[in-house]
Amino acid sequence: MAKKVKSKVDTINTKIQLVMKSGKYVLGTQQSLKTLRQGRSKLVVISANCPPIRKAEIEYYCTLSKTPIHHYSGNNLDLGTACGRHFRACVLSITDVGDSDITSA
């Protein structure tokens, strides 16, 4: 039987779910910008259909605070679902990774 190969989306989804269970995070653009300004954010995940003006602002603050950015390949509904929520989320800011190794992704 052939080996089942996980896609990159599946692995990032499982890492996000592990952060939701064991780490600390913030959902939303305004709260994510707040954690970036305070320097508490370890990783920022941006959905593919995030508005360009918001994406540019978040990327600007990420470069100032030297925070890595991950561009999520799914839309904001997919990112919200990966976080275990039933609503859309354009931006996810991870402040404590917990047991996950998402920062090495």
UniProtKB/Swiss-Prot annotation:
InterPro entries: Ribosomal_eL30-like (IPR039109), Ribosomal_eL30-like_sf (IPR029064), Ribosomal_eL30_CS (IPR022991), Ribosomal_eL8/eL30/eS12/Gad45 (IPR004038). One of its GO terms (biological process) is translation. Coiled coil: none annotated. Belongs to the eukaryotic ribosomal protein eL30 family. One of its GO terms (cellular component) is cytoplasm. One of its GO terms (molecular function) is structural constituent of ribosome. It comes from the Eukaryota. SUPFAM superfamilies: L30e-like. This is Large ribosomal subunit protein eL30. It comes from Trypanosoma brucei brucei. Keywords: Ribonucleoprotein, Ribosomal protein.
